[in-house]
Amino acid sequence: MNKLPLLNHPVAQQSVFTPAHLIKSVRRARQIPEGPIPKLCFLEFDGDLTDWLVAEGLARPFPFWPCFHTTMFAVEIEGVECGIIPRTIGGPYAVLVAEQLASSGARLIVGLTSAGRVSRELPLPCLVVVTGAIRDEGTSLHYLPAAKEVSCPAPAVADLIFRELAAIGRPVRQGKVWTTDAPYRETQMQLEWWAAESVLAVEMQAASLFAFGIAKEMAVVSVAMVSNAVDHDGEQFDTGSLREELRILAACVRAFKGVPAEIGLANRPAEPGESPNI
């Protein structure tokens, strides 16, 4: 047996503790009523957009979300009620919440993250619809056997989102990202290494979420707002106005509405303790 626990996870075995167990306890402890959650949910890792939506009266707390750790807000965009959860940063936290979203009835999870530039060919700021991620983190190893990369589990949906984002006039690319658990341990050697392998940006969630999506047959897409770079002398961390970020959500909604039947966002197989068609 390999002595590294992270490389020994029995990914083919059933979990003994499931989201359904936690959801039941949350509803009982917090007196949260039963009810469906939105089919399209956003994980908004920075949190500023959610704060602005709430302050503007565009989003409200969602009463049926069963979670000890987060608050879901409901926002209606182009006639579609969406869920948005802020600040679930990092692979473990993002996947913990994604598990509960899937168990509660979500059909598409979109992660919206800020990111750092790796490829010098990328303009700043720029959007990246993530097609795959380097697995330089730990969470994905609990869902899939060890490998260098993981692909987006919903590539057709990601393509639709890319087209809708391109239509709003902001710079947007499709490509790979490097997912890290330790942003303050990025080195120049690593940046050059991954740039040589056509990686566009670095962030903290995509590989973990993609591995979860593949393992649990859940549609997950990641959109990175690339806003900073160690070799950039201009404005750093500029993702545009919050109203422009709302346009990103609207583009995702249009893609969600346009998913053709042959692609579909069908009900995923029920986990132990879940209802089969929530």
Where are these regions (language model features)?
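Accessory terminal and edge-of-domain segments that mediate assembly/interaction
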Residues: 1-108, 117-278
